[in-house]
Amino acid sequence: MIEKNKLRSNLKNLDYKDFALSEINIKFLNTLIHQKKVCTYIPNKMEININNYLVSFSELQTTYLDDDMLNICLLNEPFVENKYKIAEPAIKIPVTDTQVFLIPGLGFTKEGIRLGRGKGLYDKLLSKYSTALKIGICAKKNLLDEIPMKEHDILMDYVLTENENFKIH
């Protein structure tokens, strides 16, 4: 079985500028998140920007880092970079009513296992929201046959690529 660090190294240099969800998956995503409190992410250069598909939402949420823990706040500008060089809102208005998480990852399996950056930040956050819908977003080229799973890893409910979607449970 391949190590997670080797997988991360292989996936960190991929280019996502041409990524686009198919019309079918845009509709599918909007069906899943319609009229729900959605926490999305502010993409970095290694993550897919799906936020332009979420323009109909007047109030989106996102994550921010506080004492090495992810928390949730309203998505608003301007952005600042945290200590890991990840953008987050400069003004944090905390929220706790999240119903759906749109989650980036370096890779996913069709079984919902996520390969993150190795700090377990999303796993710790998601463990507090067991009833929330968890949707992993990745390019098809980041769909992996297997990712080693640890006890604390949280499975996704769905994984979406450009043209495919996988319901996990």
Regions found by a protein language model. Name each.
Residues 71-169:
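Conserved phosphate- and dinucleotide-binding cores of soluble alpha/beta proteins
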